[in-house]
Amino acid sequence: MQIFVKTLTGKTITLEVESSDTIDNVKAKIQDKEGIPPDQQRLIFAGKQLEDGRTLADYNIQKESTLHLVLRLRGGAKKRKKKTYTKPKKIKHKHKKVKLAVLQFYKVDDSGKVQRLRKECPNTECGAGTFMANHFDRHYCGKCGKTYVYQKADA
């Protein structure tokens, strides 16, 4: 039977084959006519690439069918250089976990009453439970920035 092979240049080659011929045989015949080595050939029929070991009958290629010849592209993306850093990586801050950390904000006196050791921020933006930091001369809210400075006693 006769089949047609259309190349990239638009040229059509006619080949005399049998339906029992393998794709390898067809590629060898194309090499004889065009001089393109079989490892660079890709044959497409009905939108599918034809695999070397299979026969023309496997792909239902009949007389006067047209195969499309495409050349195989070798290689891939360009190799990239490995990035070199001038400074070493910054070590991430590790959060220290302290069990029952809230207990340091409260104290239970002898009568069983719970006393708050830290001053709570009165600002409405901060919300309930926002404690102010105790500094040697002031109380400071880290959320809103409100500061209360201790009064110095005149001696």
Curated annotation (Swiss-Prot):
Pfam families: Ribosomal_S27, ubiquitin. It comes from the Eukaryota. Gene3D superfamilies: 6.20.50.150, Phosphatidylinositol 3-kinase Catalytic Subunit, Chain A, domain 1 (3.10.20.90). The keyword Ribonucleoprotein applies. Residues 1-76 form the Ubiquitin-like domain. GO terms for cellular component: cytoplasm; nucleus; ribonucleoprotein complex; ribosome. InterPro entries: Ribosomal_eS31, Ribosomal_eS31_euk-type_sf, Ribosomal_zn-bd, Ubiquitin-like_dom, Ubiquitin-like_domsf, Ubiquitin_CS, Ubiquitin_dom, Ubiquitin_ubiquitin-like. Keywords: Cytoplasm, Isopeptide bond, Metal-binding, Nucleus, Ribonucleoprotein, Ribosomal protein, Ubl conjugation, Zinc, Zinc-finger. A zinc finger (C4-type) spans 121-144. SUPFAM superfamilies: Ubiquitin-like, Zn-binding ribosomal proteins. One of its GO terms (molecular function) is structural constituent of ribosome. GO terms for biological process: translation. There is a cross-link at residue 48 (Glycyl lysine isopeptide (Lys-Gly) (interchain with G-Cter in ubiquitin)). There is a cross-link at residue 76 (Glycyl lysine isopeptide (Gly-Lys) (interchain with K-? in acceptor proteins)). In the N-terminal section; belongs to the ubiquitin family. Ubiquitin is generally synthesized as a polyubiquitin precursor with tandem head to tail repeats. Often, there are one to three additional amino acids after the last repeat, removed in the mature protein. Alternatively, ubiquitin extension protein is synthesized as a single copy of ubiquitin fused to a ribosomal protein (either eL40 or eS31) or to an ubiquitin-related protein (either RUB1 or RUB2). Following translation, extension protein is cleaved from ubiquitin. PANTHER family: UBIQUITIN. This is Ubiquitin-ribosomal protein eS31 fusion protein.
